[in-house]
Amino acid sequence: MLRVRGLSFSYPNGKLALVDFGLAVEAGELVVVLGGNGSGKTTLLRCITRTLRPNAGEIWLADTNLCSLEGEKLRRARLELAMISQHASLVRRSTVLTNVATGALGRHFGWRTALGGLPASELKAARGYLTDVGLTDLAEQRASMLSGGEAQRVAIARALAQRPRVLLADEPVASLDPEACQEIMRLLQRLARSEHLAVLCVLHQVELAYTYADRVIGIRDGRIAFDLPRGQVSREAVRRLYVGEAA
């Protein structure tokens, strides 16, 4: 589903962030990326979404190379990718249901339609996505009233409303308590299976990777250190990813 080949990226100051990087994530699979601060994890996700333009390499979504697209073709292709981060970035004054329904903006309706009110079909679909994340009862509640874990589940439901084929998650549990962390990771694991999504998740929490990932990719200094099924990833290999980090 998602394949990255020979990806390299450097910042204007000349710092190499990614070097000949490659990975693959299949539909129904949850792959976790581990690495220290500044190792290139977030840069990788930003290159995959084409927020950053790689210096070299290919990013394949099914049979489409995103690196070969520009303009409207790129915009439409990017609708197949949904992104969540550690901050849910919800519209706090709007209801949970409205926040979820806006995930379909750009794919199923545009701003002109939205200004006249969200389509009934999308509101109905949004209720279904709230059911998927276990928040049906909070549909009419304002987003400002949500806990951190609830807000992140709403963000995931909003991503589902986009109808993506790939879900990218950048530190999705970084600001949550341990119970909420487990809840969100269980949800991502389940959705990968039930929605046939390719899920690529950047984490700092090593134990969550050992518990929920199908495969774990280690990244150090912009290069792949390992790419293995979680049961084959040694503690020593993970420790080496973080050697030299400030305690």
Predicted segments — roles?
Residues 34-36:
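The feature captures the beta-strand-to-loop junction immediately N-terminal to the Walker
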Residues 49:
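Helix-to-loop junction immediately C-terminal to a conserved catalytic motif
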Residues 65, 108, 113-137:
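Conserved ABC ATPase "signature" region
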Residues 66-82, 112-120, 233:
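ABC ATPase NBD coupling module
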Residues 142-146, 150:
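Conserved ABC ATPase signature
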Residues 163:
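Conserved catalytic motifs of ABC-family nucleotide-binding domains
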Residues 167-170:
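Catalytic Walker B motif of ABC-type/P-loop ATPase nucleotide-binding domains
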